[in-house]
Amino acid sequence: MKVRLADYVADFLVSHGVTDVFSVVGGGAMHLNDALGHNENLKVTYNHHEQACAIAAEAYARIDNRIAAVCVTTGPGGTNALTGVVGGWLDSIPMFIISGQVRYDTTSRYALQYTETPLRAMGDQEYDIVKSVSNMTKYATMIEDPKDIRYALEKAWHLATTGRPGPVWIDIPVNFQGGYIETDELKGYDPAEDDKLLPPEVDMDTIKTVIEKIKNAKRPVFHAGYGIRLSGAYEVFRKVAEELNIPIVTYWNAVDLIEDESPLYCGRAGNMGDRPGNWAIQNADLILAVGTRISIRQTGYNWKTWARAAEVIMVDIDKAELKKPTIHVEMPVWADAKDFLTKLEKEAAKMAPVSHSDEWLATTQKWKKEYPVVQPRQWEENGSTANVYAFVRYMSSRLPENSLTAVSNGACCVVGNQAYVIQKGSRMANNSAIASMGYGLPAAIGTCIGGKRRSTICLEGDGSIMMNLQELQTIITNKLPIKIFLINNNGYHSIRLTQNNLFKEHCKIGIGPESNDLSFPEFKKIAEAFGYKYYSATSNEEMKNVVDEVLKEDGPLFCEIFTDTKQVWEPKSSTKRLEDGTLVSPPLEDLAPFLPREELKEIMFIPLLDEE
């Protein structure tokens, strides 16, 4: 059967369950734009910047691992998308990007047979995007023969969705897009080419060994990571958690695996986690880490002191993660999280309750109650602004179950991941690895559309929103029920804190009005110009009233919360100056603001480092 190649691409996406596409149209992708835009089974959301397309697709996939395609044009269309794609690469998010390219006979690849040495470019707006994206994708290819399109599409889809997921990219010259192909002549892809790189199935001896180690441990901890969702193991994880009955610790990408009120949840560990979560890890004698790569943000920069009393069982689909030098892993398990947890659940169901688990659980719950992230002083009024910790805690505590939230970077992600109340079934999208400013608005768009256009909270910052401000219009155009809460801390607050800490003798630079070299607009005028109903708050009391009012209404809405520019991130890993003036990086049980040594000593089941 003869079909236009661009239509073949659109039909392929539909046949693989794709229903949504994010795109900015362009001449180099004209036939792709036509095919995708007129396919009755696809809804194309047109953004105002290609970075927003990529971020929206990345956040969309986080909801239930369904892929939304991205379609961009040649040259700047492709390069503009890179930040969103590298975010998906580092956080292991399945993404499918299709780009247009100049006519094949005007590409530098084609010209190479004549020039011998490569041209930088030959065609108008030509750029060989595959060379740039090969380090941030599982598969990237330019179609140099139309007959290769089936093979490329099938291989790309398979690699994006198997093993450790990630982005894939197919670049298609414009003359091939509009040309016709004979589908019966197309060569297919055999997954066996690449499946040899996948881990073997977990054997039952490994599972039984893990069960025995948990039985014999006095202070076991379940360190749950986002790989659990990526593998489709969320439901079985919940069953395993109940059966093991041991404390659960999460971190940024995985905060929504378990609700705050669960008697198993004890906290979020890491250099910007909370005290209870870190105390659980640092006091543990056994850690079962599933689907978490245990990044430096989780171990802290003094990683040799991380979980120093624990035997670590780490389950990961990427063999390299099990061997990196910043962690110690006594029992590496190279496996798919769903395969591992499914088999673990069957064995755990047979396991008799472990008597010491209740006492250890009670201890972690006591920490959670007595050492909350949001302190009483943060609820007090300062006369001019709201407190960002109080705001995040209050707003999130008012959300219903199964709510959707997209979180940008800076104050939004630090405070959001520390203080956000996760309700049962709630989802929170944030990108922790690349952590780019400008993430919040397009991520909220992807989260909302991926969540079947349910009401969505967008946590943005005054610095971050400027990176993708144009997406305010995308929300309006598509009538998306997104409620934007803008944290206004008068500039780049994370960098302000760094400059306060390290460069006190110098004046501030590049952070906002106080450095006299960077300024921001009046967001009330911006919001109203785009057509948003606007709210604001400048105190904790006003914040509570405004939040209650905003949450009762339908979006899109814009609510600006003016927050204290002196509020530091706390608790957090921080350099400590000893009495002799020496600077040291304390282990993660010792977060700033530092507790008295006697108090910390009572909390720890193991000796403090200065006692060893």
Language model feature labels by segment:
Residues 42-43, 93, 246, 310, ...:
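A structural micro-motif
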Residues 108-124, 271, 325, 332-334, ...:
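Thiamine diphosphate
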Residues 1-355, 398, 481-484, 504-505, ...:
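N-terminal alpha/beta PP-like core and its mobile active-site loop of ThDP/TPP-dependent enzymes
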Residues 225-230, 380-381, 461:
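Conserved short loop/turn motifs at secondary-structure junctions
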Residues 6-9, 14-19, 27, 32-39, ...:
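Active-site diphosphate/adenylate-binding microenvironment
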Residues 241, 280-281, 388, 468, ...:
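Active-site-proximal structural scaffolding
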Residues 1, 144-147, 212, 310-409, ...:
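Phosphate/pyrophosphate-binding active-site segments
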